[in-house]
Regions:
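Active-site-adjacent structural elements in enzyme catalytic cores
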Residues: 2-203
Length: 203
């Protein structure tokens, strides 16, 4: 079956956890909606990273300049070549052996909404190992936008309770999972990778 279509029966037979909450989130994403969901770092605002209009809404909700690109989540490193023009050999080791959330900026993105890709053509991708965001990526069969759940220029919301009511009211669906956790996660490490294999630590 093509990954461009959503078959609920097929998803229900997969071997990863599927809850009604996750199925509803995927329905919203497939319809072009925007969700609020937990990730491997802070809570995020997300949408289908291949849908230009959905990404545009995320920018509007955050009041973020469209010149600033956003991070894309995938559930499996084997999918990265589907969304970058070139993946240097060193990238595999960087991603495979990362001991904490790692966002890699690749020089040239592809098969993504144009407003996800940076003005220079680059794209920031992270492989998530967190259960909710990873399951959403698998079920959606597409990359997921991940940007912190705050207005542009404001501090990131480390916990669900710190997310503003304005943000909550602006999204189409709030994933009702992991909302009671109070640990303070750290943002991901960020590495900029060049096609010749040279990389630079940004954060």
């Amino acid at each position: 079956m093509s990954s461009n279509f959503f078959d609920l029966n097929e998803i229900m037979t997969t071997k990863f956890p599927v809850s009604d909450e996750l199925k509803e989130a995927v329905r919203v994403l497939r319809a072009g909606g925007v969700i609020l969901y937990p990730t491997d770092t802070v809570w995020g605002i997300g949408c289908d990273a291949t849908n230009h209009k959905s990404v545009e809404r995320v920018f509007e909700i955050k009041r973020r300049p469209s010149s600033k690109s956003m991070i894309v989540l995938l559930d499996n490193m084997g999918k990265i070549p589907n969304y970058v023009e070139e993946m240097p050999d060193v990238a595999w080791d960087l991603v495979k052996y990362a001991t904490e959330p790692l966002t890699v900026i690749y020089q040239k993105g592809k098969n993504l909404a144009p407003n996800v890709v940076g003005e220079d053509g680059s794209v920031a991708i992270r492989i998530t190992h967190e259960e909710v965001s990873r399951s959403l990526c698998r079920m959606l069969c597409r990359p997921l936008v991940s940007t912190s759940a705050n207005m542009s220029g404001q501090p990131s919301a480390a916990t669900f309770g710190q997310i503003s009511e304005e943000i909550k009211a602006a999204v189409d669906y709030i994933v009702p999972l992991r909302q009671n956790e109070h640990n303070t996660p750290s943002p991901s490490r960020i590495v900029k990778l060049y096609n010749d294999g040279v990389f630079k630590v940004i954060r």
